[in-house]
Amino acid sequence: MPRSLKKGPFIDDHLLKKVETQNDKGTKNVIKTWSRRSTIIPEMLGHTIAVHDGRKHVPVFVTEAMVGHKLGEFALTRTFKGHEKDDRKSRRR
């Protein structure tokens, strides 16, 4: 169930402050955050936000197509190594 429109998008206050101060100064430094739950808003366009994936911070460059999505959608937490091959050549006897 999506969030109610009357509430507006959720974004952590500390992340919003960092974005606003960089917009006021006109700088585009990397913003490091653990807030995967924050929604991407138009004020974040052009910024690089390093989102924590549980192990390291993944740099995410915010584009116009990302507005409305969550930051955590762009920093994957699981790595798929692939299934074991199932043919006779790869089996050990």
UniProtKB/Swiss-Prot annotation:
GO terms for biological process, alphabetical: ribosomal small subunit assembly; translation
GO CC terms in record: cytoplasm; small ribosomal subunit
Domain of life: Bacteria
KW Disulfide bond (keyword) present: no
Entry keyword annotation includes Ribonucleoprotein: yes
A UniProt-annotated Pfam family: Ribosomal_S19
GO molecular function: rRNA binding; structural constituent of ribosome
UniProt entry keywords in alphabetical sequence: Ribonucleoprotein, Ribosomal protein, RNA-binding, rRNA-binding
Role this protein plays: Protein S19 forms a complex with S13 that binds strongly to the 16S ribosomal RNA.
Family: Belongs to the universal ribosomal protein uS19 family.
Designated name of the protein: Small ribosomal subunit protein uS19
Provenance organism: Salinispora tropica (strain ATCC BAA-916 / DSM 44818 / JCM 13857 / NBRC 105044 / CNB-440)
Organism taxonomic ancestry: Bacteria, Bacillati, Actinomycetota, Actinomycetes, Micromonosporales
UniProt gene name: rpsS
